[in-house]
Amino acid sequence: MVSRRKKRKAGGHEESIPSPPGYSAVPVKFSAKQQAPHYLYMRQHRVRQGTQSTWPPDRTLFILNVPPYCTQESLSRCLSCCGTIKTVELQEKPDLAESPTEPKSQFFHPKPVPGFQVAYVVFQKPSGVSAALNLKGPLLVSTESHLVKSGIHKWISDYEDSVLDPEALRMEVDAFMEAYDKKIAEEEAKAKEEEGVPDEEGWVKVTRRGRRPVLPRTEAASLRVLEKEKRKRARKELLNFYAWQHRETKMEHLAQLRKKFEEDKQRIELMRAQRKFRPY
C-alpha cells in the first residue's frame, strides 16, 4: 500500500477534494507548521430568480466552513491576492441582506459568533471572484508578518481589551446620546410640521401625545420600576399557595370576626347600662 501511495504521488495524480455541488474547495492552514489543512468552500453569490438581495452578485464571493480563528482581517489578507476587496462580513448563517453600515464603536462590538461561520467577500471588480475560485492554496491565516494570537496569548489580549477607559467610554456614550437626542428632536419637529396637513390622497395623520411625561431611561428609574413590580408580585404570588396556608388564613379571619363580635357586644351592654328610664 505504501508503494502504491508513493507511485501515485510520483505520478502527480491527486485525488479531487470532496465539496458541495457548485463549490470550490480551497485549503487553509492556521500556520505553516500545521500539516492537515482545513477547507473553505467558495462560490459566487447567487440567489433564486425573484429573490431580492443587497449583495452585488457579480462581485460577491460566498464562503462556507469558515473556522473560528479566521477573522475578517485575516480572510481579507488571504484573498487580497485575487483583487481589491471592498468589504468582508462574517455571519452565523447565510443572509440575503448586508448589515447596515454604522459607525464602529471603540467599546461596543457585536457578539462574536461561536463555532464555524459563513463569509461574504465583496470585491472591487468581478475578476476578483473568478480569481478566488481558482485558488489552489493552502492559505495561511497566521504568518510571521501577521501573527494571529491564540491560546493563552489570546486570553491575555481579550482580558486587556475588556478593561475599559471610563473617560473615553463616557465621551463615546455622551456623543451617541447627543446624536440620538438630535435625531428624536428632528423627528418630533417634522411630525409637528406635518400635523394636520393632508397627504396626496387627502388623509390627515393624527398623532396622540400623552399628558404624563415618559419615565426617564436611566438605570435608577429602571431599578425603581423593577423593585416596585417585584414587591407587587411578592404580594400576589405564594398567597394561600399551600392548603395549610389557606387554613391558617381562614382561622385568622374567623378569630378576627369573633373578636369584633365580642367588642360589639360589650359596647352594646355598656350603652344599655348607661341608658336611663324616663317615663315622663
From Swiss-Prot:
It is found in: Nucleus, Nucleolus; Cell projection, Cilium; Cytoplasm, Cytoskeleton, Microtubule organizing center, Centrosome. One of its GO terms (cellular component) is cell junction. Signal peptide: none annotated. It comes from the Eukaryota. One of its GO terms (molecular function) is RNA binding. GO terms for biological process: blastocyst formation; cilium disassembly; protein localization to nucleolus; ribosomal small subunit biogenesis; ribosome biogenesis; rRNA processing. Nucleolar protein that is involved in ribosomal RNA (rRNA) processing. Also plays a role in primary cilia resorption, and cell cycle progression in neurogenesis and neocortex development. Part of the small subunit (SSU) processome, first precursor of the small eukaryotic ribosomal subunit. Residues 1-10 have a biased composition (Basic residues). Residues 59-159 form the RRM domain. Residues 1-24 are annotated as: Disordered. This is Ribosomal RNA-processing protein 7 homolog A. The modification Phosphoserine is found at S99. Disulfide bonds: none annotated. Part of the small subunit (SSU) processome, composed of more than 70 proteins and the RNA chaperone small nucleolar RNA (snoRNA) U3. Interacts with NOL6; required for NOL6 localization to nucleolus. Belongs to the RRP7 family. Pfam families: RRM_Rrp7, RRP7. The gene is Rrp7a. SUPFAM superfamilies: RNA-binding domain, RBD.
